[in-house]
Amino acid sequence: MLPSLQESMDGDEKELESSEEGGSAEERRLEPPSSSHYCLYSYRGSRLAQQRGDSEDGSPSGTNAETPSGDDFSLSLADTNLPSEVEPELRSFIAKRLSRGAVFEGLGNVASVELKIPGYRVGCYYCLFQNEKLLPETVTIDSERNPSEYVVCFLGGSEKGLELFRLELDKYIQGLKNNMNCEARGLESHIKSYLSSWFEDVVCPIQRVVLLFQEKLTFLLHAALSYTPVEVKESDEKTKRDINRFLSVASLQGLIHEGTMTSLCMAMTEEQHKSVVIDCSSSQPQFCNAGSNRFCEDWMQAFLNGAKGGNPFLFRQVLENFKLKAIQDTNNLKRFIRQAEMNHYALFKCYMFLKNCGSGDILLKIVKVEHEEMPEAKNVIAVLEEFMKEALDQSF
């Protein structure tokens, strides 16, 4: 196991649980999709600050559950699957955030909401958005004079857990807007289905991929880390979306220079001339042209260990740790290479690091692309490539 990898995973699990403290042991575990909730509100009026003795954390505890009154402010329930006794408390919480000007159109927020049901502390994602069309149940006399605005809330897991998926939830809201603008029949039921599926569609894909591939997950991790193209065959659309989502989240896109990533993708494509092919025609997916290394194998085991707890939020945290460790190793290698340009002992340290880190094959390709225009570094990398090739030949 990589140094501190297991400790990191254990720590993340404890953090995710402690962020939901106050509930029972069962509540601190992942809530199944059936207990995730949503609320859709229509919003009309000014977002001028109306300070009403808000608590520091915006908690609705000890406040009236009714929407703040006033001709310039209206927050009306359009649809929800929350229990009726809980929804007014959530509405009060959202109304406070709106009145303080703390919510901006199209940018989701994540908070922890403590409702009056004993021990019910839950993560809440909420987002304000404008839409061209009004839902039938939200049409009023003043609708034509005001832009149609809505606030959507997704509740489930913990604040820390939902924060990991905030960007995906922002994209999910864009999908909701597209659905609301459709002319299709049965629009209301379609939107209701879309809202109620948020947990399954946004939070659970990584978990489903881990459970599907098991030990073969190492091939998927290696493909994501090395920017190797992946082709999925004989698969249903849901599984294909899950795999593509996993690859997108697992890649280092956004964490390394965009030009480096583009060059690396081109280099990997030219070098291999083949994509990794995943055949899903049988119950156990089969891989062709797949690669792996010790680094990916160790992290695959971390995912399988996490599967025992059944927490999809933990899978996402492990995936984030996987990427951070890869970036850390890449930065360490760059530092060693800079030192090795003037120091033979540093060159040896560089070689030993590559040999022991578990992902030397991929890291060397990344830094090779980044240092393409630097002659001194290119010489060091050429020597390291020769050392690694000799070490590989001796291992057979």
From Swiss-Prot:
Signal peptide extent? none
Where composition is biased (Polar residues), the residues are: 58-67
Q: Has UniProt tagged this entry with the keyword Transport?
A: no
| Keyword set, alphabetical order | Cytoplasmic vesicle, Golgi apparatus, Phosphoprotein
Query: What's a single GO BP term from this record?
Result: intracellular protein transport
Q: Where in the cell is it found?
A: Golgi apparatus, trans-Golgi network; Cytoplasmic vesicle
Q: Which GO cellular component terms, listed alphabetically, does the Swiss-Prot or TrEMBL entry include?
A: cytoplasmic vesicle; cytosol; Golgi apparatus; trans-Golgi network
Residues bearing PTM Phosphoserine? 8, 18
Annotated stretches, region: Disordered:
1-78
**In which tissues has expression of this protein been reported?**
Highly expressed in testis and also expressed in fetal testis.
The record's principal subcellular location, in a coarse class, is Golgi
* Acidic residues compositional bias, start-end: 9-24
Give the function comment from the record: As component of the WDR11 complex acts together with TBC1D23 to facilitate the golgin-mediated capture of vesicles generated using AP-1. May have a role in spermatogenesis.
Subunit structure, per the record?
Component of the complex WDR11 composed of C17orf75, FAM91A1 and WDR11; FAM91A1 and WDR11 are required for proper location of the complex. Interacts with TBC1D23; this interaction may be indirect and recruits TBC1D23 to AP-1-derived vesicles.
PANTHER family, per database record: PROTEIN NJMU-R1
Record-given protein name:
Protein Njmu-R1
Question: What phylogenetic lineage does the species belong to?
Answer: Eukaryota, Metazoa, Chordata, Craniata, Vertebrata
